[in-house]
């Protein structure tokens, strides 16, 4: 049955307008983005198929064009639309992070990092460079690795901190496995970075590990 034949209160777009986006399921939100289904499938059914295929909304949003286009009804146009939506969300969150003390917006930091790093098939290590008032100077990808690890060099991080004239930093990296639990190696690396940056009077405020459905803060766990 086409969505237009559904009771009005059950149609995703009408439900969003009447009750707000937060009440919609992932499939309903995705259906609004897709706008139309394909032969034999409504937009909601197609959205459910996409989520089942990729395993989660995070992994769907992180898929490349080749993976995305394998599914019926998906192609370059829909892929470009999805990437544009994702980039607008990232930029909006980045603007918020640059508007004041980053420590006053912990949820915005988590949201930005999950949107930027969640679901990636390889490990990415990011640095957020801050001034003395903890305002964002720059958000920069520092290292990129493989499915299991990224090689991080404290000396290079110190160079970038000096280049940006940073007074403090926040680090983040993803776990492609989807599990956000920090490893012993993550803890040791964080301490190495903290010690190296202390030599140039740069504080490490936090280190986030990003999984598919969770973000772990070293500071909250007392690991900084």
UniProtKB/Swiss-Prot annotation:
Keyword Ligase among record annotations: no
PROSITE patterns reported in the protein's UniProt record: MPN (PS50249), UPF0758 (PS01302)
Species of provenance: Nitrosomonas eutropha (strain DSM 101675 / C91 / Nm57)
GO molecular function, one term: metallopeptidase activity
Keywords: Hydrolase, Metal-binding, Metalloprotease, Protease, Zinc
Domain spans labelled MPN: 102-224
Gene Ontology annotations of biological process type: proteolysis
Binding residue positions for Zn(2+): 173, 175, 186
Family (UniProt): Belongs to the UPF0758 family.
Protein name: UPF0758 protein Neut_0782
Keyword Protease carried by entry: yes
Position of sequence motif JAMM motif: 173-186
């Amino acid at each position: 049955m086409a969505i237009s034949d559904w009771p009005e209160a059950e149609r995703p777009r009408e439900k969003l307008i009447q009750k707000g986006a937060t009440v919609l399921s992932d499939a309903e939100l995705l259906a609004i983005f897709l706008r139309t289904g394909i032969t034999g499938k409504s937009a909601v059914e197609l959205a459910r198929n996409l989520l089942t295929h990729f395993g989660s909304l995070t992994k769907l949003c992180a898929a490349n064009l080749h993976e995305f286009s394998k599914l019926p009804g998906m192609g370059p146009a829909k892929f470009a639309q999805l990437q544009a939506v994702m980039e607008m969300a990232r930029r909006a969150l980045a603007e918020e992070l640059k508007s004041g003390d980053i420590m006053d917006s912990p949820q915005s930091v988590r949201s930005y990092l999950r949107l930027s790093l969640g679901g990636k098939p390889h490990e990415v290590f990011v640095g957020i460079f801050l001034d003395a008032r903890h305002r964002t100077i720059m958000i920069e990808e520092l290292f990129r690795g493989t499915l299991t690890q990224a090689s991080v060099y404290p000396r290079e991080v110190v160079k970038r901190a000096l280049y940006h004239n940073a007074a403090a930093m926040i680090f983040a990296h993803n776990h492609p496995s989807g599990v956000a639990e920090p490893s012993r190696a993550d803890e040791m690396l964080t301490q190495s970075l903290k010690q190296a940056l202390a030599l140039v009077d740069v504080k490490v405020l936090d280190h986030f590990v990003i999984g598919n459905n969770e973000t772990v803060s070293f500071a909250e766990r007392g690991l900084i």
